[in-house]
Amino acid sequence: LASITASGFAVLYMDKLNALVGRYRGEAHEDEMVGYYPLCAFGENRVAASIDTALHAFLPFPHVDHLHPDWAIALAASANGRQKLDEFNKKYGRRIVWVPWQRPGFELALMLRKAVEATPGCDGIVLGGHGLFTWGGTQQDAYVTSIKTIDQMGEFVQDHEKRAGRPL
């Protein structure tokens, strides 16, 4: 990312991307959705949009971080990850939501949107077996939330290992 310029990013109209929800025919037709992304392109921009485009776009926040830090993966991939996330939230006063593993794509994007809508005030999402989403009103807010979350998850995992004598 240090060397990429604006021309290297896919730029899409949000209203067109959101309109694709009406075209979505369900999980069995997941793969066809990526074919619609070029129809949402802004101007002459023809940079291919990522399979994860909708994951970021459907979250109602100005800045979204999608991360795969080791500490979050330790939590997300543990056999009892949802339970451990509940413990984490209680310990740190957080409201991070668990979304079970789902293949990346449109269905997962809709699951994330629904999770946020169903949990007003949530401050992150752990994707089971996958990673972490955090956000903020500005780039700086998103960054600070991401670092804070990763640091807290690291502390949580290490504390658990010390207490239990084994990893999560």
Please describe what each predicted stretch is:
Residues 1-168:
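Glycine-rich flexible loops
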